[in-house]
A protein has these predicted regions:
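Acidic donor-binding segment of Leloir-type glycosyltransferases
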Residues: 1-9
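Glycine-rich, basic loop-to-helix element that forms the pyrophosphate-binding segment
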Residues: 10-27
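Short aromatic/hydrophobic "clamp" motif used to bind/position activated sugar donors
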Residues: 32
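Conserved donor NDP-sugar-binding/catalytic core segment of glycosyltransferases
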Residues: 44-78
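Short, flexible, basic/aromatic active-site loop/helix in glycosyltransferases
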Residues: 82-107
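Acidic donor-binding loop at a coil-to-helix junction in glycosyltransferase catalytic cores
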Residues: 110, 134-141
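Active-site donor/metal-binding and catalytic loop motifs
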Residues: 129-130, 154-173, 183-187
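Non-catalytic, C-terminal membrane-associated alpha-helical segments of glycosyltransferases
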Residues: 174-184, 189, 194-241
């Protein structure tokens, strides 16, 4: 089949979330795919994504399988799982020891930069381009998506790709800590009635406190901890639109 590319330039878009929302008006397909610019798709990636949607109408949103995903040690994995519950539960990083390449696997959170969606889900689940989520945009959108489609998110194992994340430098790491902490509060404020009495917020903040202390000692720089405290202050004071 013929493939055509349309390049759209709009200079006043405020980040990836705004760009995604803006791009929807140009779509004419039943399946919409968003891709980061640091990935390489295997030759059959899009074909297998489309087949999965065709064969299982329960699939409303999907990710492919990242082949070069870095492995976490047991301590980091355990700490992550213990501190990411309730609103912040995220099973994208779970290890799949035995995998059936032809069987989609249900997950609770999708990565936005390697995601595919049925067009109709955007009729009632829109991207939030008012609150400027960035590092936790995936989690924020997945929470609202799950409210409409409880069992609609899947990993498609035979849709394979490589994802080359750029290693963060010190300044980016500090910004990540600050923004993650702030956006944890933002997610809580948007969805507090679905929270586990605030325990989920408390635990994920503990995770980032440990994270910031670790990098402060590792790099002998207290500014990582300061980033956590600034994120706390901004998160407490921020108002959700």
């Amino acid at each position: 089949k013929n493939i055509s590319n349309k390049y759209i330039e709009k200079n006043n878009l405020r980040g990836l979330v705004d760009a995604k929302k803006y791009s929807l008006q140009y779509n004419s397909s039943d399946i919409i795919t968003f891709l980061d610019d640091d990935i390489i798709l295997m030759p059959t990636y899009l074909q297998n994504i489309c087949l999965a949607f065709q064969n299982n109408f329960q699939i409303k949103g999907a990710n492919g399988l990242i082949l070069n995903k870095s492995k976490q040690n047991i301590f980091k994995k355990t700490l992550f799982n213990l501190t990411h519950i309730g609103l912040y539960k995220d099973d994208r990083g779970k290890t799949i020891k035995t995998i059936d390449k032809d069987k989609p696997i249900q997950v609770n959170t999708l990565s936005g930069g390697i995601s595919s969606w049925r067009r109709e889900i955007f009729n009632n689940t829109q991207f939030d381009n008012k609150n400027f989520f960035h590092f936790m945009e995936d989690v924020e959108f997945s929470i609202r998506f799950k409210k409409k489609y409880k069992a609609g998110a899947y990993l498609i194992p035979n849709a394979e790709l490589l994802h080359y994340h750029i290693e963060s430098n010190a300044e980016n790491k500090k910004k990540q800590i600050l923004m993650h902490v702030k956006e944890c509060f933002m997610i809580f404020k948007k969805n507090r009635r679905f929270s586990i009495l605030g325990l989920d917020l408390t635990l994920i903040l503990l995770y980032y406190l440990i994270y910031s202390i670790y990098f402060s000692f590792k790099n002998k720089n207290i500014k990582y901890l300061f980033s956590f405290l600034i994120g706390m202050t901004r998160g407490i004071n921020i108002k959700i639109k």
